[in-house]
């Protein structure tokens, strides 16, 4: 019996050798020396050029036709929640200050602690409700104006801020409406100016 192995450049046996269609066998050592001229190395798992997987900037997977910046509706949740948390934190500190001031003549006892705790709870809830209501009005007006105009720019911000101030102070009569509108116009105008400060200085603005 001949136990000799065929040479690396031989042909596969079987049906291929019978019909004369055998394919030559090459070892990995022989294939490793074959130059791949003009070809990029491919990932063995993805079968793509790995250079396409290296991104210099952040890229997000977006649906077709979607914007890379968040709209008014997406920002509304963050705005309302952030204002409620900010109002609660500010109200808590203000209530603690007021409670300590009003009970400074009382000795440290349970009645004083209860009074301070009541003041903290009341002020925190009041400020959270106030700022949350303002944020809700601002978000509703912003989304409505964006849908009506079909565009998202600083004009929407200023208009939404002005209308928010007018509605929030509408219980104070015409003077209250005018005062609230001016306050909303000033605050939204300052925010728009701050948001475009890099653009005014000649730099490319960053959108979030």
Curated annotation (Swiss-Prot):
CC per GO annotation: membrane; mitochondrial intermembrane space protein transporter complex; TIM23 mitochondrial import inner membrane translocase complex
Pfam families on file: Tim17 (PF02466)
Key words, A-Z: Developmental protein, Membrane, Mitochondrion, Mitochondrion inner membrane, Protein transport, Translocation, Transmembrane, Transmembrane helix, Transport
GO terms classed as biological process: intracellular protein transport; protein import into mitochondrial matrix; protein insertion into mitochondrial inner membrane
Predominant subcellular localization, coarse grouping: mitochondrion
GO molecular function, one term: protein transmembrane transporter activity
Localization (cell): Mitochondrion inner membrane
Stretches of the chain forming a coiled coil according to its record: none
Transmembrane residue ranges: 73-93, 125-145, 173-193
Topology versus the membrane: Multi-pass membrane protein
Family indicated by similarity: Belongs to the Tim17/Tim22/Tim23 family.
Full protein name: Mitochondrial import inner membrane translocase subunit Tim23
Lineage: Eukaryota, Metazoa, Chordata, Craniata, Vertebrata
């Amino acid at each position: 019996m001949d136990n000799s192995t065929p040479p690396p450049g031989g042909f596969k046996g079987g049906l291929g050798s019978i019909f004369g269609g055998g394919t030559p066998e090459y070892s990995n050592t022989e294939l490793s020396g074959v130059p791949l001229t003009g070809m990029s190395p491919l990932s063995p798992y993805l079968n793509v050029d790995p250079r396409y997987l290296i991104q210099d900037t952040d890229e997000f997977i977006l649906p077709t036709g979607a914007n890379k910046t968040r709209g008014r509706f997406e920002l509304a949740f963050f705005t309302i929640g952030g204002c409620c948390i900010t109002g609660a934190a500010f109200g808590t500190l203000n209530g603690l200050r007021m409670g300590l001031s009003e009970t400074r003549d009382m000795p440290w006892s349970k009645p004083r602690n209860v009074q301070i705790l009541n003041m903290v709870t009341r002020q925190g809830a009041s400020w959270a409700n106030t700022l949350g209501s303002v944020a809700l009005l601002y978000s509703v007006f912003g989304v409505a104006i964006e849908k009506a105009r079909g565009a998202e720019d600083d004009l929407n911000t200023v208009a939404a801020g002005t209308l928010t101030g007018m509605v929030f102070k509408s219980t104070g009569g015409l003077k209250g409406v005018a005062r609230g509108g001016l306050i909303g116009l000033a605050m939204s105008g300052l925010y728009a100016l701050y948001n475009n400060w890099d653009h005014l200085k000649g730099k490319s603005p960053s959108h979030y």
